[in-house]
Amino acid sequence: MTDNASSQPRIDARAKGTLTVDGLTFKDLDGDGQLAPYEDWRLSPQERAADLVSRMSLEEKAGLMIIGSHYMGDSPLAKNPTPGKLLNEDDSWADKHPISGAPFEKPVLATSGARQGILERHQRFYIVRDNPEADRLAEWSNALQEIAEGSRLGIPVVLTSNPRNHVSVAPPTFGVTEAAGKFADFPGELGLAALQDPALMRKFGDVCRQQWRAAGIHKMYGYMADMPTEPRWSRVNGTFGEDVQLVSDYVREVTLGMQGEKLGPDSLAATVKHFPGGGVRLDGHDPHFHWGQTNEYPTSGSLEKYHLPPFQAALDAGASSIMPYYSRPMNNSAEVMPKNLWFTDSEQFEEVAFAYDDRITNQLLRGQMGHAGYINSDSGIIDAMPWGVEHLTEPQRFARAVKTGVDIFSDMSDPAGILEAVAEGEAGGELGLVEADLEPGCARLLTEIFTLGLFENPYVDPANALAVANDAEMKALGADTQRRSVTVLRNEVGALPLKRDAKLYVDVQQRKDSLFVTGLLRDALREAGVTLVDTIEEAEAAVIWMRPSIFLFTDDKEGVPISVNPADNGVDVDHVVEVQNAVPTTLVVNVTNPWILHEVEPDAAAVLATYEISAANLVAVLLGEATPEGKLPLTMPRSAEAVAAAPRDVPGLDCGDDYPYIDRAGNVYTYGYGQTL
């Protein structure tokens, strides 16, 4: 029995009846008029899960083990979007993967219609990629839950999402950051890291928890525990910087903020990613693509020293699930695996993707590091990024992954492959499954759902969802954190704070939508009373917000080098220098990667670093109305040659004295550097 065996939880039943037993109320989820063990909230989640698994059909078990993207009825990503429509009722098929663009062998179900997915394919886990207002999100969540409650066993839906609480003036990226602006907006992950404040992360995680659960989202694909040891990787901006102790502290605290000291009915479940560390990229290329599929470790002991500690911190905090990355580790690596986990006496690795490697998932993650929750694959490991197991059929890939510990498959909407794997195994095929192979994973998944309290009450109040999303205190914390995160790199001539009466020229340099963001910054300055001009010739001072970027799905190309030179990533360096030579210029560098600054820094009057910030909050810093406190969360490299020579598995702060950039005043732009105004 649970600790609160007699404490009546709130029961909300909309499609099924209730039962009264011993003066207590329970949901009659299977509709038989009797209290089944899985309906009895006095039992532990593990006991309830074991009972429910025993009642589930093979098809229901297979459906539970997929988590696919799902859209609202008016979503532009739905097959037939209809303005104002709440539920998407149309199946949608695709001939290529939506994230990697890899062609499928045959058309794949990209997303189910709501009722077809829940009632026919028995799916319960969904990825939310739309970005509606919180009350609309809550209404949609409730509608899905009511369909699920009306199913044979009444198993509720679990909605998950990538992060939603970071300010963004850049276009959204499918599969990475799709949503912003509807909840309290904090700086990007690197901006949080710039404050070196683990206690803040506990508060931040709690804000996410309150706002998401109020809107009917139950789990986050986050946060990233990856160490960004290769500066050219396009996902550096999703990390907490390069200091392994701070990253570990941050991952622990944000997980505790989201989940609490232990997972419970008010928790936001965390899926920490990408085990055992996705930052070890070959020349920056990502394993979403076949040319970036390998993890090659040049430094002995780097896995244990740098890449595993943040995941251990997540596990120590009770992270509900872990997501392995697509990569496959290679035997040209230095020695990084414990000898007892080597593939053979002479080979560390089987050279298959982490999700398919029993030594990584079951033996290292579960056995040695103590993971007690479930393993959630990354998107597309079966049909798009099956690195190292391409020779297997898709059902055989499902079978192999299940046997190596994967419990749920991301961005899958069709359980047919799992059912085919069981059919193959039960017909005697050695590379298939039997139904019993699905049951441990189903039990782990159901344990989370029971622990989250969704069997008793999965419904939320839309009005409350909107109120919590717009909570003034939470929004103020986010805005204050944005302002504090800014890093002062140089201001030795006193260019800052800006003078309101100085005629100011403003420019934003970025690859896409630069005029739009320039307009946002000009509007914010104008509202603050700053005198603006349209040309350099009229100006007495200038602000250039330099926003270079490496986009995962457009810049990572086969045979094309990835660069961290701003000139290669949307910045007109000649124009920047022209402005700097004409008038005293404050250069604001938005740091999503460790940029090479030798062409743009020397002629600037002042240099700041941002890590995603709204225009209004940046203006507050420029005018001296807010105090920037940030320190560099990444070491800025001296040159492209320094980047190429550095080991891809060691952070910049440990790459030696010849690695960091030194500015015109002699400041060394290494991890933790930053001045004050």
Regions found by a protein language model. Name each.
Residues 1-29, 101-105, 109-111, 210, ...:
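C-terminal non-catalytic regions of proteins with extracellular/luminal or membrane-system context
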Residues 3-276, 281, 306-323, 347-414, ...:
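N-terminal beta-rich core of secreted/periplasmic extracellular enzymes
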Residues 232-236, 284-285, 333-336, 554-559, ...:
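Short acidic, glycine/proline-rich loop/turn micro-motifs
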Residues 282-304:
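Binuclear metal-dependent hydrolase catalytic cores centered on His/Asp/Glu-rich metal-binding motifs
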Residues 301-310, 525-530:
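A Trp-anchored, charged/polar loop motif used as the substrate-binding/catalytic surface
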Residues 328-332:
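Extended catalytic-interface subdomain
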Residues 333, 443, 450-465:
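Conserved, charged catalytic cores of large soluble enzymes
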Residues 461-475:
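Histidine-centered catalytic/metal-binding microenvironments
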